[in-house]
Swiss-Prot record:
Signal peptide: none annotated. It is a lipid-anchor. Disulfide bonds join 209-240, 219-230. Residues 206-248 form the CHCH domain. This is MICOS complex subunit mic25-b. It comes from Xenopus laevis.
């Protein structure tokens, strides 16, 4: 009973007030085992009582036939000796039954602990296997992801290169246009300046009203304190200048 796991196991147990095993190695027996032990102890006690009741009847019969006893010449055991021997045998059988129950309880506890440990180990193994599968799948997808990332980078680099080329071409075109505009503007400026200079040189003007101008200057010099004396000359000079301007506008209009 108990299997190979309980063979050779040293068990220490304690007895309660009714001399029944209750605790072994700090492990308390279950109620089911205690109930079975109680039932078997009750059965053993009833068997011992019936055995002790039958012993005196045998003794009485032997006493009623002393001649037969003496005739055989054999020594018969007394009732007390027979009862003591039966009690020892019953105690031994009780001890064996209790040992069997203890071995069964130990086997049950060992099996429960083994199952719990196996369950924990299985859960841990499954968790580690799941994590390993996840890492493996990540590792399998990683090269494909790297290739895709590399392609994306190449595509973006190509787009940037195209944009750089486009902007360089646009900048070069703008610089060329600006240079052409500058040259054209410079040519137009020089042409306009040359034409203006030619027009100015072609027009030569003689002084107008020179006589009146000389008379006014002379009058002002002679009449420094009384400038009003030269007012008539000034009016004539203004009329002469106005007439000369009109003639100039009319001739070049």
């Amino acid at each position: 009973m108990g299997g190979s796991e309980s063979t050779g196991r040293k068990v220490s147990f304690g007895m309660d007030e009714e001399e029944r095993v209750r605790v072994l190695r700090g492990v308390r027996l279950s109620d089911e085992v205690v109930t079975r032990m109680k039932d078997q102890s009750t059965w053993a006690a009833s068997g011992a009582a019936s055995g002790s009741a039958t012993v005196p009847s045998k003794v009485g019969s032997s006493a009623s036939h002393p001649a037969a006893a003496s005739k055989d010449g054999a020594h018969k055991p007394t009732a007390a000796g027979v009862g003591h021997q039966y009690a020892e045998e019953d105690l031994y059988r009780r001890y064996e039954r209790e040992q069997t129950l203890i071995q069964e309880e130990l086997a049950r506890l060992a099996k429960r602990e083994k199952d719990a440990a196996h369950q924990r180990l299985s859960t841990s193994i499954l968790r580690e296997k799941k994590m390993a599968d996840q890492e493996r799948r990540k590792a399998e997808h990683l090269p494909a992801d790297l290739d895709e990332w590399a392609k994306d980078l190449e595509h973006k680099e190509a787009e940037l290169q195209n944009l750089n080329t486009f902007y360089r071409e646009q900048l070069s075109s703008i610089e060329k246009k600006n240079l052409e505009i500058y040259r054209l503007t410079e040519e137009q400026f020089h042409t306009a300046a040359t034409n203006a200079e030619l027009r100015v040189k072609q027009r030569s003007y003689d002084p107008v009203c020179m006589d009146l101008q000389s008379n006014i200057l002379k009058c002002y010099a002679e009449n420094k304190q009384e400038r009003l004396n030269c007012s008539d000359l000034a009016k004539e000079y203004q009329k002469c200048v106005s007439a000369a301007q009109k003639n100039l506008l009319f001739n070049h209009g």
